[in-house]
């Protein structure tokens, strides 16, 4: 899908501002400069009062790996067992689109038996998901692995980062 971190922020702003003709440069985040890479890009952070935004690293991690029963799991399907990289029709309840199992993106929710303990879908595999974490000064956090990466990238122990212009 090749969505940059800044594209994701602009989409969040658009949603935050009610869609339609809503502004993409202010809202949940203030993006300065009017260019694809904002002049404040390395330091842009969530504005107070935002109602639609990217998650922080901690918010993403909890939604994917935490059980309301007080346990953290290794994989975002509510299990410590290694996730199976399979096509959606072979979903066993611990499955994802990873390791070239499908060789393409799948629809959101295609692995209907493989929700996290909070009921979220697709936090493992399919596409990398940006979060707000700043890593190494100029990169931003991302989680979840993708359809082209091995199952290890889905694990709680595998945080990742990438250039925000990605």
Protein language model features and the residues they cover:
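Extracytoplasmic Gram-positive cell-surface binding/anchoring modules and repeats
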Residues: 1-2
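Functional-site microenvironments in short loops/helix caps that host divalent-cation chemistry
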Residues: 5-155
